Every structure is written in structure tokens, then in C-alpha cells.
């Protein structure tokens, strides 16, 4: 009964105006009132402030500053294995698995369209048909900066206007085509593991979505699809990001969806729906080995060892003596 009421509110409430109001309030400096709101939020959601670079809630001038607070580097170490892709966000996995042609699993018994998620861009969709996806939900208590799973060169960004439904587990199980309906920012990267899309999905009360290369993408909410492109490789104007580097952030909210090309990566076997995610931990492994970390060096053939012994030294030991 309660869940039905909550779902009804999702359709009845003026989500856009609520989101604008929340964004406006979260950006205001209100002194003691700001601190009070932050303290209540920390207590209610059990936010671990010991992980933050600034653990004192009085150091945040606005609620938004608190919400996108940076963490201390050592609390999210990045897996350095070049064959491993890492988790892009703190949260829980909503769903993950194989993309079945054009179908992505939203919740048990509910699929949505890959092409619809990508705003009807069939050329981009073709890159990921029968590939792999991971959907990560960020709850209010989580760190809300989003990082790179691997090294990447940005090629395209698309802003897609849409609804602002909540993206929690209740709505994911009950609102059809949720992620293809909500406002979102699609980022396409060239990587060592083939093309990768990282999609930042908005929701109710999500005041803004930002990227490190373009700043605030939304608001303003103009109701039209916008598209930007960047050059490949090391050309002038290209945007290159490293594994584990921040690429964007939410000011309240939301969900991150990753898409990988078919045959390029295998998801870590232990991961399943509702698995907890932490930035920097293993998410997937390449199907091809680029470098074997900590591998024992192969022994030199005997003839090469003898040749090394016979070679003249690069430094004259006698000359260097004092």
C-alpha cells in the first residue's frame, strides 16, 4: 500500500519544480541553517565524514559543497592492474549483465531499449549491441563524484532532456523504461577495451549534472537534445582522462550506466544485483591481456649472458675512482 502511494506521487508531484527548488536551496549560503541541514542529513543517512577531505561540516558554505565533497585519496585506492576496469562510483549495482541485442535489463521482468537510452542514436547503439552493461545506483549517503573505469579519450557527449523520476529500486521495478525516459548525459570514450559509454542519469531533486571538461551541463533545461564531439587521440582539443580520474558529478542523485562493446570485457564474477560498489575496486577484466602485472622476467639465453659478461663496461671504473 505504501509503495503504491510512493509510486503515485512520482506521477503526481511537479518533479521539475521540486528539482529546481532543491537546486536553488542547495546552492544558497545560509550560515548556521546550512550547517544544521548538513548535520541532520549526515545523521539521518549515516554519512561517513571521516572519509572526506574536510570532515568538519562547518567547513561547507552550501549544501551542494557538502554533497560533492572530495574524499581523501587513500580511502579509494585504484586497482593498478592494466587489465582491470574499476568501479566508477560508490553505490550499489542495480543490474548488470549482457545486452541482448537492443534490450537492457532494468529490473526483474522489465527491459528497456539500448537505442532509446542513447536517444535514438542507432550508430552508437550498434557499438554496444550484445555487449555488457552495468547500472550503479548512488544513494543519498554516497560520494557523488563519478570516476573513469579505465583510460579514455572523450569522443562525444549528448545531453538528453527527459523526466525526473526517482531512480531508486522501487521505481526501477515499477516505472517502465525508466532510464530511457529520465534526463541524462551520455559520454562516449575510446579506450583500450574498445568503445565505452558512461551515462549520468538525472532524477528527482538532482539539481545538476556536471563534467570536468564542460562544467555544468544541466541546468538550464531547454528541452532539446544537445551534442558535442571531440577529436581522437592526441590531436589539439582532445580530452584524455586516466583510470580512476574524476569525470563528472551529481548535485543530488542518481545513477551511472556503463556500456561496453561485445567481447571486450568480462564482469567480475562475484558481482551481482545489490552488490556494494566502491570507486577503484575491480568491475571487469579485459578479455585480452595487455600486461601481466608482477610477472617473473624470462631468463636470458646462455649465449646472451656470456655476451654481457664479455661486453665493455659503459663506465670506466678506474677513471671514476677518487
Swiss-Prot record:
Specify the species: Escherichia coli (strain 55989 / EAEC)
Which residues does the annotation list for site: Cleavage (non-hydrolytic)? 253-254
Could you describe the subunit structure of this protein? Answer: Heterodimer of a large membrane-associated beta subunit and a small pyruvoyl-containing alpha subunit.
| Biological or metabolic pathway of the protein | Phospholipid metabolism; phosphatidylethanolamine biosynthesis; phosphatidylethanolamine from CDP-diacylglycerol: step 2/2
> Where are the Pyruvic acid (Ser) residues found in this chain?
254
- A Pfam family of the record is PS_Dcarbxylase
The protein here is known as Phosphatidylserine decarboxylase proenzyme
The record's remark on the cofactor is:
Binds 1 pyruvoyl group covalently per subunit.
Cysteine pairings via disulfide bonds: none
The upper taxonomy is: Bacteria, Pseudomonadati, Pseudomonadota, Gammaproteobacteria, Enterobacterales
Q: Which residues carry out catalysis?
A: 90, 147, 254
Amino acid at each position: 500500500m505504501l509503495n503504491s502511494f510512493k509510486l503515485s506521487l512520482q506521477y503526481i508531484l511537479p518533479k521539475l519544480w521540486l528539482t529546481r527548488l532543491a537546486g536553488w536551496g542547495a546552492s544558497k549560503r545560509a550560515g548556521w541553517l546550512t550547517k544544521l541541514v548538513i548535520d541532520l542529513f549526515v545523521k539521518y543517512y549515516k554519512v561517513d565524514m571521516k572519509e572526506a577531505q574536510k570532515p568538519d561540516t562547518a567547513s561547507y558554505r552550501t549544501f551542494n559543497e557538502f554533497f560533492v565533497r572530495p574524499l581523501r585519496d587513500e580511502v579509494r585506492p585504484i586497482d593498478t592492474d592494466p587489465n582491470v576496469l574499476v568501479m566508477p562510483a560508490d553505490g550499489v549495482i542495480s543490474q548488470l549483465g549482457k545486452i541482448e541485442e537492443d534490450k537492457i535489463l532494468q529490473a526483474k521482468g522489465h527491459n528497456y531499449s539500448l537505442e532509446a537510452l542513447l536517444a535514438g542514436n542507432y550508430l552508437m547503439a550498434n557499438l554496444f549491441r550484445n555487449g555488457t552493461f552495468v547500472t550503479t545506483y548512488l544513494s543519498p549517503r554516497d560520494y557523488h563524484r563519478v570516476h573513469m573505469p579505465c583510460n579514455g579519450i572523450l569522443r562525444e557527449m549528448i545531453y538528453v532532456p527527459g523526466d525526473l523520476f526517482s531512480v531508486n529500486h522501487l521505481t526501477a521495478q515499477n516505472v517502465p523504461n525508466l532510464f530511457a525516459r529520465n534526463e541524462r548525459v551520455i559520454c562516449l570514450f575510446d579506450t583500450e577495451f574498445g568503445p565505452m559509454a558512461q551515462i549520468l542519469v538525472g532524477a528527482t531533486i538532482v539539481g545538476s549534472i556536471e563534467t570536468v571538461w564542460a562544467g555544468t551541463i544541466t541546468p538550464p533545461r531547454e528541452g532539446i537534445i544537445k551534442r558535442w564531439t571531440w577529436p581522437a587521440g592526441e590531436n589539439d582539443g582532445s580530452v584524455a582522462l586516466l583510470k580512476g580520474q574524476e569525470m563528472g558529478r551529481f548535485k543530488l542523485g542518481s545513477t551511472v550506466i556503463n556500456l561496453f562493446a561485445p567481447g571486450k570485457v568480462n564482469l567480475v564474477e562475484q558481482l551481482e544485483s545489490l552488490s556494494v560498489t566502491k570507486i577503484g575496486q575491480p568491475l571487469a577484466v579485459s578479455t585480452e591481456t595487455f600486461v601481466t602485472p608482477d610477472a617473473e622476467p624470462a631468463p636470458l639465453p646462455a649465449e646472451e649472458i656470456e655476451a654481457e659478461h664479455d661486453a665493455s663496461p659503459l663506465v670506466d671504473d678506474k677513471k671514476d675512482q677518487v
